[in-house]
Amino acid sequence: MAIKQFNLAEGQRAERKLLITVAEWKETQTTTPQGGGDPVTEEVTVREILGTRTEDSSIEYNPDIETTTDIRGFNYTDLNKTQPQQGFDPYLILGGSKLGAFLNDIRKRNAVSELNQFTMYIITAYIGTEGAYEAEKHVQCTITYDSLGGDTRVNFPITVYFSNNVTTGTVDKLSDDFVFTADVNVQP
């Protein structure tokens, strides 16, 4: 895959809103057909763009580094892996937040095994063009809720743990109803 250039003018700084994190998960929904009949249960994909009301959030890569010094006094550094994560604090309880309601349901049931079922997208809208923004798709990620409370508003801070099981590609738009297209001929 060729290195893509930033779609910014010379010296222009990328705005933070151009780095977008999206959570995706499956939910079971039951609906009753119009006009009656038996209820229909189906699994649907749900997405939410993270960061509403969060003032600062960064992906931290947490490198696992091993440094050794040989008998000649030279230092060698080995990077074993990265363990990327991203915190969202505050992550306020907001009306209409699909992820907040989903996580709160998991919290109430103490169903912690359900916290590792997320697909996460990192969209870098400062790379690519309209209709083909660069993106990474991470499968089997974990989202944890860190606390519940606050002073004047109910805060429910969360942390996203990316799996490093990544597929690169593009998304066609910067909303939660995007279509992800995987890159072809990319070796993992």
Task: Describe each model-derived feature in a short phrase.
Residues 35-39, 129-133, 152:
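Short, solvent-exposed loop/turn segments that connect beta-strands within catalytic domains
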Residues 138-188:
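Mixed-charge, glycine-accented linear interaction segment located at domain edges/termini
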Residues 34-35, 69-73, 175, 188:
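Surface-exposed ligand/attachment interfaces on beta-rich extracellular proteins
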Residues 1-56:
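Polar/acidic, low-complexity leader/linker segments enriched in S/T/G and N/D
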Residues 5-9, 71-137, 171-173:
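Extracellular/virion structural assembly segments
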